[in-house]
C-alpha cells in the first residue's frame, strides 16, 4: 500500500482512481464497490484493511447469518438466560446469585499451519472472551478432530495441538475438564481444533462490549502489537487450503500465557473496583474489531490515535496495526476520573496500558496516524452491516445413494468367537480407545474445584465451596451421523451432550455450538449447513435449552474434498450439590445393571460399521427429544436421591463400549444377560439414541423401578457388577486385563 503520501481521507477523496488491493485482502469486487458506495469515495488503505477483515467470513458470518437467525427465532423461553447471542459469550443464571459464561470457538486453520501456536492461541482467545464478560475463567474443554490416526501428518499435527492446549491452559492455571478426540480421514489437512471455556461471576459483575459516554477514554492494555496474525481472520479462517502451508505461517498468532495470566488478574481487579464502562478483547481482526464493535454497540462514536498504540515492531504500517492479531490484548472504556486508577492497576500487574482514544458524541469512528485522519467511517457499517449472502444450497446428488447403502445389511459375526473378536477390535480402535495418553498432558485438577474430568461423561466444576453448587459441561459431535443426515446428525450431537450432562446428575440449561463445515460456495455443503442449523434450532426449542452463542468455521476442505459436516455442541448444566454427582465407573460388586431406553437395529454411521467394515452409509439412529428429556429427568432424580451409583450414556460403540469403559475405570467386571427380544450382536453394538446404563444398589432396586415405571421410561435389567471380566452369558468372557490392553495401548502405540 502507498505510504507516500499518507493515504488520508482527504487524499483518498482527491485521488478516486487509485487502485487498491481489495482482492488480495479477500474482498469480492461487489463487496469493494459496496464499501465505495457506503463511504461515497474510495476507501483509504486503512479503511480497506478494516472492512476486509471485518467483512471476512470469519468475522461477519456473511454466508451463515441467514440460517443462524433461527437460533433467535426459535429460542425457547428460559429464565436462566442472562446474556445471549451477540456478546463475547453467553451468560446463564445458575442460582445463588452466580452466573456462568461459556462458549466454544474454532482455531482450525491456524492449527494446521502451526499446530502448537494455533491451538495455544485458540485457548487464549476463548479465555479472553470469558474475561470480557466480567467472569473469572475456571475451566477449558477441547473437542478435537484429526485425520486418520495412522497418517504421518496426524503425528505432526496432533502432538503440537495437544502441547499447545496443555501448555497454554496449564500456565493459566485452568483445569482441562472435557472434550473429545476423533480420527477420520476426512479431517486430513483440515483438523478441527475447537476450544471452549467456562467462567464464573456474580450477577452484578456482568460486563458488555459497548463504548458509551462522550469523553470516556479508550485504553488499550496487554501485550505490545506486533506483526503476527495479520489478516488471520481474512486469510486463514476464510479460505480453503491449497498447498500453501509455509506461506500462510505469518498469519498465525503467537501466544504468551504468562502475559494472559497477568491480563486476567489485572482485568478482574479493575472490574472489582467498578472502573470499566465497556470492554472488548482483541481477537480476530484485532483493533479493527475492538474499535468498531465497541463504538457501534455504544451510544456515540470514537476517536483513536494509532501513534499511541504500543508496538513490538516499529516498522508496522497503520494498516498492519489495525489488522494485527497479536494476542493477550484488551480494550477498555473508562471514565476520565478513573483512568489514573485503571493505569495504576495495570502497572501493578506489569501490564502495558495506554490511552489511545476517546468516545465522542457523534456517530463516526475516526482514526488518526501521524496527524492525518486515515479512517472516517460509521462503525456499524464495519461491524454489523457487512454483506449477507443467501448462498444457493441443494441436497447433493449422492445423498440418496449414501442413505440407501444400509449398514444394517452388513455381514454380522456368525459365532461367539467372532463376536468376542469384534468387541476387542472395537474397544481398541483409535476412536473408541482410551485417550489417556493425550488427556494426561492436561492438568485436570488445578484450582482444586474440579469434580469430574475426562473420561467422565461431562466435566464438572464446583462454583461455591459452602453450598456445593456446581456446573457441568459436555461437548459432542458426530460427523459420520451428520454426513448421513445433517438435520438428524445435529440433533444427535445435541442429544448426546444433553444426555452426558444428565448422567452426571446435572440439569442441562443452555447450549453453545461450533459449526465446522466445508466451503459455503458449494451448494451441497451449504445444504448440509442449513439442515444442521435447522436441526439444532428445532432440537434446542424442544429440549428447552437456548443457544447462547457459538462459532461458525467454513472452508474446511482441501481442494474438492470437504470434511464431514461437523456440528459440535456444548451443553452446560447445573447441579445443586456436587457431592451428589454420579460417575461413570462401577463402584461396588453386586450392584444391578439397568439399561434405560429402547434398543433397535441401528448401525448407520456406527463405530461397528466403521471399525469392522470401513463403511459409512444408511441412516443415523432415530432421535426422540421428548424421550431424551424424560431420560434426563430420571437420571437427575436418581442421582439426586441416591438411587444410582454410576451412570454412562450410550453413544459411539453402543452398550459394549459403555460397559467396558465403566468396568475399566472402576476396576470391576460385569456379567451381562442378553434381554428377551434382542440378539447379542444388536444388544452390544446398536447405537440407538436416548439410552444410558446405570448401576443400582440392591437396596434401591424397587424405588428405581417404580420411578421409571411411573414416568413411562423403558428399563431393562441386563446384569450385575461382578468379578474381573466382562461376561456376556452364553457368548464370551473377556478378562479386564485383555480389555485394558486393547483399550489403553492403541493411542500410545500410534503417537508416542
Curated annotation (Swiss-Prot):
Keyword annotations: ATP-binding, Cytoplasm, Ligase, Magnesium, Metal-binding, Nucleotide-binding, Purine biosynthesis
Catalytic activity: N(2)-formyl-N(1)-(5-phospho-beta-D-ribosyl)glycinamide + L-glutamine + ATP + H2O = 2-formamido-N(1)-(5-O-phospho-beta-D-ribosyl)acetamidine + L-glutamate + ADP + phosphate + H(+)
Binding positions (ATP): 61, 103, 513, 550
Residue positions binding substrate: 106-109, 128, 253, 325-327, 553
Gene Ontology BP terms: 'de novo' IMP biosynthetic process; purine nucleotide biosynthetic process
Keyword ATP-binding appears in the UniProt entry: yes
EC class name: ligase
Pathway the protein contributes to: Purine metabolism; IMP biosynthesis via de novo pathway; 5-amino-1-(5-phospho-D-ribosyl)imidazole from N(2)-formyl-N(1)-(5-phospho-D-ribosyl)glycinamide: step 1/2
Binding-site list for Mg(2+) 1: 105, 551
GO cellular component terms, A-Z: cytoplasm
Keyword Transferase: no
Entry's localization field: Cytoplasm
Active site: 58, 107
List of residues binding Mg(2+) 2: 129, 281
Family: Belongs to the FGAMS family.
Biological role: Part of the phosphoribosylformylglycinamidine synthase complex involved in the purines biosynthetic pathway. Catalyzes the ATP-dependent conversion of formylglycinamide ribonucleotide (FGAR) and glutamine to yield formylglycinamidine ribonucleotide (FGAM) and glutamate. The FGAM synthase complex is composed of three subunits. PurQ produces an ammonia molecule by converting glutamine to glutamate. PurL transfers the ammonia molecule to FGAR to form FGAM in an ATP-dependent manner.
Oligomeric and partner information: Monomer. Part of the FGAM synthase complex composed of 1 PurL, 1 PurQ and 2 PurS subunits.
Name of the protein: Phosphoribosylformylglycinamidine synthase subunit PurL
Amino acid at each position: 500500500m502507498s505510504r507516500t503520501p499518507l493515504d488520508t481521507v482527504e487524499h483518498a477523496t482527491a485521488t478516486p482512481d487509485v487502485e487498491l488491493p481489495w482482492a488480495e485482502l479477500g474482498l469480492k469486487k461487489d463487496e469493494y464497490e459496496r464499501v465505495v458506495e457506503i463511504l461515497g469515495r474510495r476507501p483509504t488503505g486503512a479503511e480497506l484493511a478494516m472492512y476486509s477483515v471485518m467483512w471476512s467470513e470469519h468475522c461477519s458470518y456473511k454466508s451463515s447469518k441467514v440460517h443462524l437467525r433461527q437460533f433467535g427465532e426459535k429460542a425457547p423461553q428460559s429464565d436462566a438466560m442472562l446474556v445471549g447471542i451477540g456478546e463475547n459469550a453467553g451468560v446463564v443464571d445458575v442460582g445463588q446469585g452466580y452466573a456462568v459464561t461459556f462458549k466454544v470457538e474454532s482455531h482450525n486453520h491456524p492449527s494446521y499451519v502451526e499446530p502448537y501456536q494455533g491451538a495455544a492461541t485458540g485457548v487464549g482467545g476463548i479465555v479472553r472472551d470469558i474475561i470480557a464478560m466480567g467472569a473469572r475463567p475456571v475451566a477449558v474443554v477441547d473437542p478435537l478432530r484429526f485425520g486418520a490416526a495412522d497418517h504421518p501428518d496426524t503425528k505432526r499435527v496432533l502432538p503440537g495441538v495437544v502441547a499447545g492446549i496443555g501448555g497454554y491452559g496449564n500456565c493459566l492455571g485452568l483445569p482441562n475438564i472435557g472434550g473429545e478426540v476423533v480420527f477420520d480421514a476426512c479431517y486430513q489437512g483440515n483438523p478441527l481444533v475447537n476450544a471452549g471455556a467456562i467462567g464464573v461471576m456474580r450477577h452484578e459483575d456482568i460486563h458488555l462490549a459497548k463504548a458509551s459516554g462522550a469523553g470516556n477514554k479508550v485504553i488499550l492494555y496487554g501485550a505490545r502489537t506486533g506483526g503476527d496474525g495479520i489478516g488471520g481472520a481474512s486469510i486463514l479462517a476464510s479460505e480453503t487450503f491449497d498447498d500453501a502451508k509455509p506461506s500462510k505461517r505469518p498469519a498465525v498468532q503467537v501466544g504468551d500465557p504468562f502475559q494472559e495470566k497477568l491480563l486476567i488478574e489485572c482485568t478482574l481487579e479493575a472490574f472489582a473496583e467498578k472502573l470499566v464502562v465497556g470492554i472488548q478483547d482483541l481477537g480476530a481482526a484485532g483493533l479493527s474489531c475492538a474499535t468498531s464493535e465497541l463504538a457501534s454497540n455504544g451510544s456515540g462514536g470514537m476517536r483513536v490515535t494509532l501513534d499511541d498504540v504500543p508496538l513490538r515492531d516499529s516498522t508496522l504500517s497503520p494498516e498492519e496495526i489495525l489488522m494485527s492479531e497479536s494476542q493477550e490484548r484488551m480494550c477498555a472504556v473508562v471514565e476520565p476520573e478513573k483512568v489514573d486508577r485503571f493505569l495504576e492497576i495495570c502497572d501493578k500487574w506489569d501490564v502495558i496500558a495506554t490511552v489511545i482514544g476517546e468516545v465522542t458524541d457523534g456517530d463516526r469512528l475516526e482514526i488518526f496516524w501521524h496527524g492525518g485522519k486515515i479512517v472516517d467511517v460509521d462503525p456499524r457499517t464495519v461491524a454489523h452491516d457487512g454483506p449477507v449472502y443467501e448462498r444457493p444450497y441443494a441436497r447433493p446428488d449422492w445423498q440418496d445413494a449414501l442413505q440407501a447403502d444400509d449398514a444394517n445389511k452388513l455381514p454380522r459375526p456368525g459365532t461367539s468367537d467372532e463376536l468376542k473378536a469384534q468387541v476387542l477390535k472395537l474397544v481398541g480402535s483409535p476412536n473408541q480407545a482410551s485417550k489417556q495418553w493425550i488427556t494426561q498432558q492436561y492438568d485436570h485438577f488445578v484450582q482444586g474445584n474440579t469434580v469430574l474430568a475426562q473420561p467422565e461423561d461431562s466435566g464438572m466444576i464446583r462454583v461455591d465451596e459452602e453450598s456445593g453448587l456446581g456446573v457441568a459441561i459436555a461437548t459432542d459431535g458426530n460427523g459420520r451421523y451428520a454426513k448421513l443426515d445433517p438435520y438428524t446428525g445435529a440433533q444427535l450431537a445435541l442429544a448426546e451432550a444433553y444426555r452426558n450432562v444428565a448422567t452426571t446428575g446435572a440439569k442441562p440449561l443452555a447450549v453453545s455450538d461450533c459449526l465446522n463445515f466445508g466451503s459455503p460456495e458449494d451448494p451441497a455443503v451449504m445444504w448440509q449447513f442449513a439442515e444442521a442449523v435447522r436441526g439444532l434450532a428445532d432440537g434446542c426449542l424442544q429440549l428447552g435449552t437456548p443457544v447462547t452463542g457459538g462459532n461458525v468455521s467454513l472452508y474446511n476442505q482441501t481442494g474438492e474434498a470437504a470434511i464431514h459436516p461437523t456440528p459440535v455442541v456444548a451443553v452446560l448444566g447445573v447441579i445443586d450439590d456436587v457431592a451428589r454427582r454420579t460417575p461413570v465407573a462401577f463402584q461396588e460388586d453386586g450392584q444391578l445393571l439397568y439399561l434405560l431406553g429402547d434398543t433397535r437395529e441401528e448401525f448407520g454411521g456406527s463405530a461397528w460399521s466403521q471399525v469392522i467394515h470401513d463403511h459409512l452409509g444408511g441412516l443415523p439412529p432415530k432421535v426422540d427429544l421428548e424421550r431424551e428429556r424424560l431420560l434426563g429427568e430420571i437420571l437427575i432424580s436418581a442421582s439426586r436421591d441416591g438411587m444410582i451409583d454410576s451412570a454412562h450414556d450410550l453413544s459411539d460403540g453402543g452398550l459394549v463400549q459403555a460397559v467396558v469403559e465403566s468396568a475399566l475405570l472402576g476396576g470391576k467386571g460385569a456379567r451381562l444377560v442378553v434381554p428377551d427380544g434382542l440378539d447379542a450382536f444388536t444388544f452390544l453394538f446398536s447405537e440407538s439414541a436416548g439410552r444410558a446404563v446405570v448401576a443400582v444398589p440392591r437396596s434401591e432396586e424397587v424405588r428405581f423401578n417404580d420411578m421409571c415405571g411411573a414416568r413411562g421410561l423403558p428399563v431393562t435389567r441386563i446384569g450385575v457388577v461382578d468379578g474381573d471380566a466382562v461376561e456376556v452369558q452364553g457368548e464370551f468372557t473377556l478378562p479386564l486385563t485383555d480389555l485394558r490392553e486393547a483399550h489403553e495401548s492403541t493411542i500410545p502405540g500410534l503417537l508416542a
